[in-house]
Amino acid sequence: MHNVSLTIFANFKIDNEERYLRMKDSFISFKDIPAERWVINIRGSYKSDTFDFLKKHLGEKLYHYDLQSSNGWFHDTRVMLKDINSEYIFFWIEDHINMADVTIYDNILKDMCENKVEHFIYSWWHKSVLNKYEYINKKETNNINIYNLSDSNIRIIEKRIGTYFMPISAVSISTNMFFRKIVTSNHPKLKRWPRETPFDFEKRSSDFEFFPFVLSFPKFELFANIDDNHGTVGYSLIDRGLYENRMTRDEIKSIEFRKSFNYYRLIKPIFPNVIWKLLVSISDYIRRLVYTYG
């Protein structure tokens, strides 16, 4: 079989020293992955330091962008697509650390190619994510579990867990075509997140236009998040004692999002539950209008 081509893609904001240090640690953990190009857009006050660091290590493999248009993350990502022509695209999220020998990724990519996998989630490897898929049939290789995310299989999972789930993730390796389908769509029409963020890349099981597709997960842990437990106590590398706790997650968020107090907690007890749910729904709708048209 031919060698499967891979591009590392990132469009991230490095805006404080802790974020910069974590980016460096993340990079070092998988820098020898067999990728032809690293197509990277860098935003934030540490963008020069980040560029210098990546250029030093990557040389001519680095395809650097300095984009931060008012049109937002998806617009700027579409500009970058002209330098991405590989079969697969690795979406690098800078606060996840590789835990595996990078030589395994050759075998994973070959398994993906042979089994026509379109989307592979390389992190968040814990039971609250993986157990959702135990209700549908899977195909296996030595390295990955493979699932057909058909409409019927999605409905089976939703019925068993009682809600929607998130089968399309940023921490992923996708086929070029599938990645482009996501970033060139105008979905959702009412944005769930601010336009300068990448979070609308991730899709719910109710986002029908992206299904069916072939999804896979590793059979062993590859990457893990530095400080986010992702709803599973003890999951993060900091909680496992595997990463230095220089700054807490709340401290980083207070710097990056300028949030120091949650007013919802203060006013929620004032309202009956039914009224509170209605107010939250109205607030959420207004927020999405602002994200879309503001």
Q: Where do the language-model regions lie?
A:
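A conserved hydrophobic helix/loop-capping motif in glycosyltransferases and polysaccharide synthases
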Residues: 6-16
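Short, well-formed alpha-helical segments that are part of the catalytic scaffolds
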Residues: 15-31
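C-terminal catalytic/acceptor-binding lobe
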Residues: 19, 171-177, 181-294
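Acidic donor-binding segment of Leloir-type glycosyltransferases
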Residues: 27-64
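Active-site nucleotide-sugar/metal-binding loop of Leloir-type enzymes
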Residues: 78-88
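Short beta-strand-to-loop acidic/aromatic patch adjacent to the donor-nucleotide binding site
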Residues: 87-97
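Conserved donor-nucleotide/metal-binding helix-loop-beta segment in metal-dependent transferases, i.e.
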Residues: 100-128
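A recurrent flexible, glycine/aromatic-enriched loop bordering the glycosyltransferase active site
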Residues: 153-174
